[in-house]
Design a protein with these regions (language model features):
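Glycoside hydrolase catalytic-domain context in secreted enzymes
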Residues: 1-466, 474-483, 488, 532-1003
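Terminal connector regions
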Residues: 459-527
């Protein structure tokens, strides 16, 4: 009997275990359903397509994935060739003859940055800098093999390189690569330690100086390649550096007892973020196949520790974090005390004030090695204004014609830059001495050839913002000077030119009356949708005082002012700066209660789930955002459907088959497709980083690059992979500090250059069907503490609007795409038509806070981006909102968010029933669908079409698993029943036998 009982227990245990196992699998699958749909999607079925229409809206050029990859690699090479920037070329050291014999020095010549910190040696099809040179020149294989045997640069180069020194006599030239890399969560170090005498991570290191010294002593000519998105201190390249002797002996400023022979360094080229084909591009430039035409996108300061941002970059923690709504009792902050004076805006203004004897102790030449916009060529160019520029009063726009002439002996491309100087009154609105107004790049010009390029400058982009007094944009009266420049410092030369020469390079316009962009006479700025007034008083402006109002460490930020640069120079936080005491800030970090009356201003329940129209999403392609047709279409969605689309936006945006909405897939990143569970085939993972794109100063090329991204998505589909619709890029944050960990994802220190390039690149990508989630809005200029409860970013509203928001403004206002869509003719027949629509299709918000409020729920989203700029794109979070912490999903929804970068259900969205919640759910869903309708996900889907999907394979496997387990459990149950039945029978028999035995004993 015990054996049978044991069998029942065993079988019951097995059956129970199988049920528990399958239940666990079911729960896990339910939680990860979106990810499983990414990996194992069902097939799309399109039905009811109207009138035999094919729905081929996008004209793709590629016919295969291989063709798309080749196109992408060619575009990457072209971008690098136009963006790499020649910064030094003494004695015409470059170009080199193709017969030059080259020794390549530096481990990172073969392990350079393509974009961020990726190593090309680990990427199929990539050409490292070293490999590119080896493909072009005869290179020293002994040295190459030596570096192949190690995994870093040599601490003592001489001790290692002496082993192959016997080969040097055959080689005249050494090419040395210096690299810096950073990445997400990884800023450049402000101090790399005592062993390096506490120099920064962007200062040349001891072993690098030793390597350059070794190269100078063993080769006739040394070429330096700078492979870094972060601006390094490059004083060692400057013969006029205070630490450089006349004969090229350099004294290390961090170790004054050490000197190095750098006399043979004759040329240097910036090659940061050069993409998968950067090696080929570099080799083509070095031998003159390509004439370099890139220009620097940042100012190269001689000593970064003296930059205005240096004292307020890094880790600063509130001492009363435990009192706040803080994860692990940690809340951090960053103070943008420098205000508008970022990059060249500081250095050029400081130079002017010093020249006027208003800034003692500042010397431009000892502060700046290479100015913003600087770049050399193998030829020379002359620029001059051609005719008088025009000013369009209605559109408040200047139009310039610039004649660019190749005055040298080889073909090349020239860049014209125009900087605007606005009138400044001491003590008035802060103004940089010059700001970039516009730029243009020529075609390839032969020697002696000229081209006239058009440069348009919108007044809106250099108008000042007065956050203190008028609390709006202000155009002061006075003289406005437009400098036709080679770089940001050209104004200093032009001011001293003869009248004849000055007329070629300087245009001045007098504005007799100030414009206050809120009064009845002036109204809003021309490009704005509504009047712009202070939106950030509670989040930002309250935190700022004048430099002489109070004392350092009083808990406020003291404005850096041109009126007294020296005494107002930024300082590090101290004292009460580390205490969050203001009630406005405390309210912003407090837990958000979605049920408070103030958070539910809408009382009338919006329409949902109405009788269906005949519209599907294909009918909405090409329909303007404000068209009433959208109201009819949106009213037919259920709340559940809208919640699903809003809450599941992580790499996989959900479908609504009933309303003709297909599912779509999104991918990282700004420089190539990164999988995240998507089916990505053999793509060009590493395009050039955004700084390299910006360095081309070529918006036409940027648009072609965006188109190439779209072609690759289509190519991936042709190969059986995912059709990518959304990309988490490009990057529009500002190079506030050289130490920013993600500078490789962002274009520049200048918002006009960044905004123009982003608008062009997004326009190209969107025309090929992509939704570009430009990231990270806003103030994500450092990585330190970014994900630790989101650091609080404090910047006054003037700097926020003029520096950190302007790139986004230009992207929203200027990015355009031409789409194809079906319209009806006079007979009611569908005809394919063309239309220009906004290409600012998406934005990704940030982890950090704007002020003390999470940036993903900032007042700036609705108040500035939508209300003022007219933004109609889809806004997605950077990762998901989190319940009861600072990334609050309900607040994000109410502030203009449209998607959460999660795929795990509602993820903290508590309110899905109130009128306010449903109103904003409809608004969010409309933004999602408006941009989907004009994307590649509609390719092949004509008006009237319905979309459905076969069941995902993983669900079939799950159901099959349940069937198998169910069958096994059923069999198990039968066996248990049989055993139990048999046991009962045996028991009955035993009882009967026992009973019979007793009778026999009694008789």
């Amino acid at each position: 009997m015990k054996r049978k009982t044991s069998k029942i227990v065993t079988l019951s245990t097995i059956g129970g275990a199988l049920l528990v196992l399958m239940t666990g699998v079911q729960i896990a699958a339910s939680i990860q359903s979106a990810n499983l749909d990414l990996l194992f999607p069902g097939d799309q079925i399109i039905t009811d397509s109207g009138e035999g229409l094919d729905g081929n809206y996008i004209n793709y050029e590629v016919k295969s994935q291989d063709e798309a990859l080749k196109k992408a690699q060619d575009m990457t090479q072209l971008t690098a060739e136009e963006g790499m920037t020649l910064i030094k070329n003494d004695d015409n050291a470059l170009p080199m003859a193709s017969t030059t014999k080259v020794t390549i020095l530096g481990y990172y010549s073969w392990h350079n940055n393509m974009s961020g910190g990726e190593d090309p040696s680990n990427t199929t099809g990539a050409i490292s800098l070293g490999k590119g040179l080896a493909n072009k020149f005869q290179t020293n294989e002994a040295v190459t093999n030596l570096y192949a045997s190690v995994n870093d640069d040599f601490a003592d180069p001489a001790s290692k390189l002496d082993t192959v020194k016997g080969t040097f006599s055959e080689y005249d030239t050494a090419v040395v690569t210096l690299k810096r890399n950073s990445g997400e969560g990884n800023d450049q170090s402000l101090d790399i330690g005592a062993s390096e005498n506490h120099r920064t991570g962007l200062t040349i290191k001891t072993n690098e100086l030793k390597l350059l010294d070794y190269a100078s002593k063993n080769f006739k000519k040394v070429i330096v390649v700078i492979n870094s998105a972060n601006t390094m201190e490059l004083g060692f390249l400057d013969p006029n550096d205070p630490n450089m002797s006349a004969d090229g002996i350099y004294t290390d400023p961090y170790n004054t007892g050490a000197t190095y022979d750098l006399s043979k360094i004759k040329a240097a080229i910036w090659a940061g973020c050069c993409g998968s084909q950067g090696g080929t591009a570099l080799a083509n430039i070095l031998d003159g196949t390509v004439n370099p035409s890139g220009h620097l996108v940042d100012t190269y300061a001689r000593d970064l520790t003296k930059d205005p941002t240096y004292k307020n970059f890094g880790s600063y923690k509130y001492s009363n974090s435990a009192e706040l709504n803080s994860y692990q009792d940690e809340t951090f902050f960053v103070e943008y005390e420098e205000g508008i004076y970022v990059g060249y805006r500081y250095y050029e203004t400081a130079a002017y004030e010093a020249d006027k004897e208003n800034y003692s102790g500042f010397n431009y030449d000892t502060s700046v090695v290479y100015p913003f916009g600087y770049g050399l060529s193998y030829t020379s160019f002359s620029n001059e204004y051609e005719g008088a520029p025009t000013y369009d009063e209605k559109n408040e726009t200047y139009s310039f014609k610039v004649k660019v002439t190749n005055t040298g002996s080889v073909a090349g491309k020239g860049v014209a830059q125009i900087y605007v100087n606005a009138p400044y009154t001491k003590g008035g609105i802060e103004k940089a001495h010059v700001v970039l107004g516009g730029f243009a790049k020529t075609k390839m010009l032969q020697p002696g050839e000229s081209e006239t390029v058009d440069i348009e400058i919108k007044e809106d982009y250099f108008t000042s913002y007065d956050y203190k007094n008028e609390k709006c944009y202000v155009m002061d009266s006075g003289y406005y000077n437009f400098y036709l420049s080679d770089d940001a410092h050209s104004w200093a030369t032009i001011d001293n030119e003869s009248d004849t020469e000055k007329a070629k390079h300087l245009y001045t316009r007098y504005v007799s009356e100030s414009k206050i962009y809120k009064d009845g006479k002036t109204g809003k700025r021309v490009t704005d949708k509504s009047v712009a007034t202070n939106k950030e008083d509670d989040e930002l402006n309250w935190k700022f005082k004048e430099y002489n109002e109070g004392s350092v460490g009083d808990g406020y930020i003291h404005n850096f002012t041109r009126a007294n640069f020296k005494d107002s120079f930024p300082t590090s936080p101290t004292g009460n700066d580390f205490v969050m005491s203001d009630e406005r800030a405390k309210k912003q970090v407090a837990k958000y209660n979605v049920w408070d009356e103030e958070n539910n201003p809408i009382t009338e329940m919006p329409e949902t789930n109405t009788d269906k129209t005949s519209y599907t999403l294909a009918d909405m392609r090409g329909v303007d955002y404000d068209d009433p047709k959208w109201d009819d279409y949106m009213n037919q969605f259920t709340v559940d459907s809208m919640v699903n689309m809003f809450s599941n936006g992580g790499w996989n945006e959900l479908e609504d088959a009933e309303n003709g909405v297909p599912k779509s897939f999104d991918a990282d990143s700004p420089y190539g497709y990164y999988a995240h569970a998507l089916d990505i085939k053999n793509v060009n993972k590493w395009y050039c980083g955004d700084p390299m794109v910006a360095a081309t100063f070529n918006t036409t090329l940027a648009k072609e690059l965006g188109e190439c991204f779209g072609e690759e998505s289509y190519g991936n589909k042709l190969a059986g992979g995912s059709l990518i619709t959304g990309i988490y890029g490009y990057g529009l944050n500002t190079h506030r500090s050289a130490f920013g960990g993600r500078n490789y994802e962002y274009y520049s220190e200048d918002p006009v250059l960044a905004g123009k390039m982003a608008a062009a690149e997004a326009g190209g990508a969107s025309e090929k069907g992509l939704v570009t989630f430009m990231k990270h809005y806003a103030l994500n200029e450092q990585e330190t503490n970014r994900q630790k409860n989101g650091y609080c970013s404090y910047v006054n509203e003037q700097a926020f609007r003029e520096v950190y928001n302007r790139g986004w403004e230009i992207y929203i206002k200027e990015a355009e795409m031409e789409i194809n869509y079906y319209n009806t003719d006079s007979n009611g027949k569908y005809v394919m038509s063309k239309k220009t629509m906004p290409a600012a299709t998406g934005i990704m918000t940030c982890y950090n806070r704007i002020g003390a409020r999470w940036g993903g729920a900032s007042d700036a989203l609705f108040g500035i981006l939508r209300d003022e700029f007219g933004y109609t794109g889809t806004t997605v979070t950077d990762a998901g909102g989190q319940p009861n912490t600072y990334m609050t999903t309900d607040l994000m929804l109410r502030k203009g968010g449209a998607l959460t970068l999660t795929n795990n259900g509602t993820n903290g969205l508590y309110d899905t029933e109130s009128a306010t919640a449903i109103y904003y759910l409809k608004d969010a869903t409309k933004h999602i669908l408006y941009n989907k309708a004009n994307s590649n996900i509609m390719q092949g889907i004509a008006p009237g079409a319905h979309v459905s999907y076969t069941i995902s394979p993983w669900k079939i496997w799950l159901y099959t698993g349940w069937g198998v387990i169910g069958g096994l459990v059923a069999i198990d149950a039968v066996f248990i029943a049989l055993i139990a039945f048999n046991k009962i029978k045996i028991k009955e028999k035993e009882v009967k036998v026992s009973a019979n035995g007793s009778d026999e004993e009694e008789f």
